[in-house]
């Protein structure tokens, strides 16, 4: 594709964007549907602190398609845009820019100053977001945006929290939760699940000495840094353990029997002492590894506990327990009154209790701890293990699990409501419902919602010194209790507010909400519910539709569901489309640092937004699968789909203007069979699109219209070209124009939600004076049942299947389509044969074959060969496959032909019979010399490849026509321009030209031909003969 084409595509789309803006078309679509049923849509809010990427453009395209379709289908579709403003993404940018990376740096800078800096950068890339949203062709209302940092939004978040609290679904507690040491704050379980990586970590087996010199317990861990906080060991009471003596060291070890070969693969290296049950080990004491907390021994520490979660598939069957750093450890130790110690601060560094490592980052201490254990003869094994480990989704630093005091939403109490809500949601793809999302709901844990951060919605809890709580649910309530005017709810405005009541002083707890709590409250907070627009909010709840990426099954989809189920016992949305991830072409994550993907702007400038939209919509990424992005793929969509459609429009416009066709004067026109076929295909497409869109299956909606463009351009127009060229104003020509006009107008409306630019361009060139101003103001087409002719569509499908079969044979055997052949034999069922009897000439034209023969049996020139399909039949018959192979090899042609017709056969193996069908058999053909054969799903085609002199001469004539018309196109001649030719060629080509002169001149609009005896002009190879032409335009 040349640069001029690329520039024109981009310029044309920019022109359409200007038209939409100048004429306010989006607002007119809303005005046009005022009073119609509302189609409610929730838009997942992005952060404007980062630039939009392909994932955002994909999700935006999906949302745009569904909303445009709903609007054209008669709904009022408000599309408010929202911004996620709070949380770590914003704070992290400010910390980096101001160098506030040390502990306490934000407090020294001032929380008020820090928050105001956050407020300043929230919309850093808002203009870029607006540009990309517009450029991709997406319509949203930027004039009515909602923002999570707005006072009204934050007040509604407070109302949501207060409502949950009133239902007994909020509590304070200490739990082990995912913790980001880089941010110094806990994260939720679903945040921890968003960024797992394959990493190499330490793998150590430690020797814990039983009291009274009774040997050592071996315990395995991948987190040596937690060993300083070891408070207990655990065994499975029902597992069998063994005691052995290491011959080299003389030490006695206890470990799980199943794990023995893993750590002692050489049977000669140890002496067997005996077996013992896990139950017999429970309660025994051991010596602390480190001295830091040995005083806890008096408080039930350093004992062996029972735990039924232990498996012997890895490790030693004995688990080291540091209750502050593992959820299972925490609960097991809590149950047995083992004390909790947590000598790690919020930055992940050891506190003063661990005097030998104080101030050291825990992951950095792994090697030092292992070295010390080795020096003290407490280390049995040291190595590395590769495994999946969670990283912070914002800072990309490793998470730890840490016991913290936090505020929780009691999600487990409402799990049954969430599961019930999920049952009523329509998921696309469907497997997400009970798969990724359903399983996540089944394993849902209480949600840690408090964050030790600054720029967020403050948790509205005020606490007195004696622990009494005041939970505030509105600004009015806070003003009444505090006596102060509230103008902002951020920390630096309300942290100093003290409430005095009943002789007590209440101060706010120092936490803000997890920013996912903000986005989960979005259905209500965007409208300031329940303080304003309550009726509107309730009428639009649950949303008819939402869409985001697969990662949101553990993010926004989840938090929406938690809050909606808890507050209203309903889902937050009825329908959802989940998209996959767009990767770089090499299969890696797209990375600015690696520069492994083209910028979205470059792609849209080069190939247009429609090409990008269609490339994404027609890919597996809309089925929640990963897509390796390829700019060649976008280019291919443009070349193979969009440009042919544009060419179809140009073809219609050229000849309609040439002959003065008026689409209003088309009454009582008798349509040709091919006209009826393309109209039937068109309205069948309308039905398929409507059905697919009702199921929110965009891939299924797009596929048929991409195929229809091929039907229209490469079959209907190509087959009907001479009808449009007819110089006489015949009824047939008017029928062709009328049909093509109807197809292009209706089709522009079908594709409008998906590829809105080319749809608008087509419509503007076709619309009449009284038609709506824009294609997007039109109703989506309805099925016209009387125009749908299934038998005709099936017949044309058969014809095209045969033609494709014939072309594949020509390609396989290097037979040019322009070279005529004498015969083709089409073998099919009797019913198909009768239906196709009248279209032999059409098939002959397409395949460039003189005689088309329809047969019920394979002709004598071909022998049909069958053999077992080993892959499928092997599973069915097992070791009897060789017998079947011999039986099939001996079948006569009559039986094979019967199988070809029926698709089934019975094979006798002695007294036993086995039924076989088409999937059990592979078919091939042995052809006589000069013949080739191939089959499709319904037909066998046999081509007679023998060339006679007349066929050879006609082949040369057709090549001449092709080359002359290529030269016409290269010279950019008008379709009606006449030409004169000077030709230099060998005798055989001159003879072919003379023999087929009338045909050649008619096809190329040539008025005169001169044969010259010297080379001049462009040289061509005509079936192995060197030929040169000079082509000149002549006046009529």
UniProtKB/Swiss-Prot annotation:
Keyword annotations: Aminoacyl-tRNA synthetase, ATP-binding, Cytoplasm, Ligase, Metal-binding, Nucleotide-binding, Protein biosynthesis, Zinc
First-listed, main subcellular location of the protein, grouped into a coarse class: cytoplasm
UniProt subcellular location: Cytoplasm
GO-annotated cellular components: cytoplasm
Catalytic activity: tRNA(Ile) + L-isoleucine + ATP = L-isoleucyl-tRNA(Ile) + AMP + diphosphate
Lineage top rank: taxon: Bacteria
Assembly: Monomer.
Protein name (record): Isoleucine--tRNA ligase
Species of origin: Chlamydia trachomatis serovar D (strain ATCC VR-885 / DSM 19411 / UW-3/Cx)
